[in-house]
Amino acid sequence: TGGFFNFWPTSLWDAAQYMYQQDYVAKDAQGNGQIAVSGHSMGGFSSEMALYLDETNYASTGYRIIRAGLSMGADYSWTSYLGLDEATAVATFGGRTVGKVCGQYDEFFFAADEPPTKSGTVYRKNYVATTAGKTLLEQENPQANTWYTCADGGQRIIYQPNEIHPWNHFSTASTKDAIEFYATAFSDQSGLHQSDLVLERDL
């Protein structure tokens, strides 16, 4: 596990800091970055850690680098070893737009209230109904695929597509969820003139 914990805890946070320094990355009037982080499985853990580390950094800098985060196929089971569980995550979301894609038949995660013996088996899970899901959405009876405005002013959602862990990479359901998430998170950025866009050029 030594190599495992050497990579993902800071990888997306490192990337976000690098991107923030680029002059083509938008910042608001207060210097907050208009950056979103997302990742699947281990990348999802890294996304969760990036939000946490960004909020820790905000305490000393006064600005946030990351505006939104969407993890896919990842809960807080591994980040908890680094002190980041659901309650800590909620306390450090800092008003950001935060979402999770939690496949109902994920083989590895989202069985928060189930006995450990069920880990690694394929059966239907309803993450929003678990203690963890309720904590993240700050609701007593949350529903999947539903936006909630939480105590810090940020919006949160848990998507629960009817799929297994690896499908989060490429399924039409997860792709739709990701597009919908970012359209919501950056809704105030719509209507940009084409001269304000930086596009890749085909060579």
Residue ranges and their predicted role:
Residues T1-L199:
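Soluble extramembrane regions of membrane proteins in the secretory/endomembrane system
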